[in-house]
C-alpha cells in the first residue's frame, strides 16, 4: 500500500512543507571567515601560523609527490641525503612542474632545463647558463620548512619570523612503548564540517550504533558500530581551554550499577584533535589518547585528515587495533571512514564519511536548526571566529612548546573509570556523573603545572579521591 493522500490542512504547519521551504535551500554560505583557507584569507593565514601535516612519509619515494595544501600546489620529496623538501610545484625558471623533477643527492633537479634546487629553495645550479651567472644570487624556488616525525611530513607555510616550535605532547611518547602509526583520510568537502564531527560526540551513540538497514550483514553492522558503552547516550559538557585557543568535551556514561566512564576529547585550534579510546570503553582505570589528527584543507571543498593512531597496552589492552590497516587514505577502525565503499553499502551502513560529505562541498550553516546537542559545534565556530579576528590571547601551547626544557606537554584527552554507585533517580544519577566528569577534567588541568613524571601518579591518586567523595 502506498501513502494515503495528505489531509487538506497538511502543509499549513510543519507537515509537507517542501514547497514552502524550497527556496530557502538556496542560501549563501555563512562563516566564510572560518571556511575559506586560501592565501590571504583570515583562516588561511591563521592555519599557516602552525605546523601542518602535508603527506605521509611512505609517500616520499624515489620520485617527487605532487600535493595541494591550503590552496597551494606543491611538491614534496626526500633527497638522497634524507632531507625533506616542500617546494612550490612550478619551477622558478619557466614553470615546468617539479613533480617530474629528478631527486638528487642534495635537493631536486627540474626535468626541463636542469635547474637544481636545495630543499630550502636555493638555486644550486643552472646548467645552461654561463658560469658567471648571477641567477644563483637572485633567484630561488618557493620552499617551506619541513620535517618528518613518526611517518608524517610536516611543513610550516607561514611567515618565517613567526615559525613556532612543534609541540610534543605526552601522548606522543607515553606510556612507554607507544607506537604512533600514521594515516590519512581524504574528504570531498570543506575542512570544518569534518573537524566539527570530532566535537559532536552525541553522534557516536546514534550514527555509530546500529544505524543500519534491517537485515544487513551482521559482520558489516558490527564493523560500523562502536562497542563497549558507546551506545549509552552520554552526559556531555563543553569547555574552552588554553585561553580560548582550544576546547574539550567531557562525556560521562554509566557502565553498570557501580561504575561510570568519563571520556575527554580535546581540540587545539586551528585544526588539531586528540581522542581517547576508540575500540571500546577502555578497561583501564585511566588511559590517554588513542588518536591524534589534523584536518588539513586542500582547498575550500576538499580536505585531508592526517594523524596518528596510538598503539599501546593502555588504550588497547586487548589488541583490537590493526596497525597494518592504517596508511594512505585508510584507517583501522569503524567502517565508513573513507570514500572507497560501494554506494549500496554506504546506504545500508552509513558512516562518518557519508554523514559529513553529504552535507555538501561546503555545509550551509544558514539551513541548520541547532538544538542543545549542538552547543559544542557552535562553541567551536565561535572560538575559531574569535581566533581569526585576533580576539583570543596568545596560544599558551605555542609559548610552552618553545620552552619545555625537554619536557613533553600535557593534554587532556583520556578515559577514566570510576566506582560510583547508581543514584535512585535518573536526574540524581545524571547529576553525579556530570559532577564526576567536571572533577576529572579539573584533575587533568592540574597536570599543566606538574613535571611529566608526576602527572600520571597525580591523576590516579586524585581519581581515588573523587570516588571517596562521591
From Swiss-Prot:
GO MF annotations, alphabetized: 2 iron, 2 sulfur cluster binding; iron ion binding; monooxygenase activity
Keyword set includes Metal-binding: yes
E.C. designation(s): 1.14.13.229, 1.14.19.48
Binding site for [2Fe-2S] cluster: 91, 93, 110, 113
Phenotypic consequence of gene deletion: Mutants are not able to grow on the tertiary alcohols TBA and TAA.
Cofactor: [2Fe-2S] cluster
Domain Rieske: 51-155
Entry annotated with the keyword Iron: yes
CDD domains attached to this UniProt entry: Rieske_RO_Alpha_PhDO_like
Induction behaviour: Induced in the presence of tert-butyl alcohol (TBA).
Technological use: Shows a biotechnological potential for the synthesis of enantiopure short-chain diols and unsaturated alcohols from secondary alcoholic precursors.
Catalytic activity: tert-butanol + NADPH + O2 + H(+) = 2-methylpropane-1,2-diol + NADP(+) + H2O; 2-methylbutan-2-ol + NADPH + O2 + H(+) = 3-hydroxy-3-methylbut-1-ene + NADP(+) + 2 H2O
Pfam families to which the protein is assigned, alphabetical: Rieske
Cofactor note as given: Binds 1 [2Fe-2S] cluster per subunit.
Keywords on record: 2Fe-2S, Iron, Iron-sulfur, Metal-binding, Monooxygenase, NADP, Oxidoreductase
Homology family: Belongs to the bacterial ring-hydroxylating dioxygenase alpha subunit family.
Oligomeric and partner information: This two-component enzyme is composed of an oxygenase (MdpJ) and a reductase (MdpK).
Primary role: Oxygenase component of a two-component system involved in the degradation of tertiary alcohols such as tert-butyl alcohol (TBA) and tert-amyl alcohol (TAA). In the presence of TBA, catalyzes the hydroxylation of TBA to 2-methylpropane-1,2-diol. In the presence of TAA, functions as a desaturase, enabling the degradation of TAA and resulting in the formation of the hemiterpene 3-hydroxy-3-methylbut-1-ene. The specificity of the catalysis depends strongly on the molecule structure of the substrate, allowing either hydroxylation or desaturation reactions.
Name this protein carries in UniProt: Tert-butanol monooxygenase / tert-amyl alcohol desaturase oxygenase subunit
Gene that encodes the chain: mdpJ
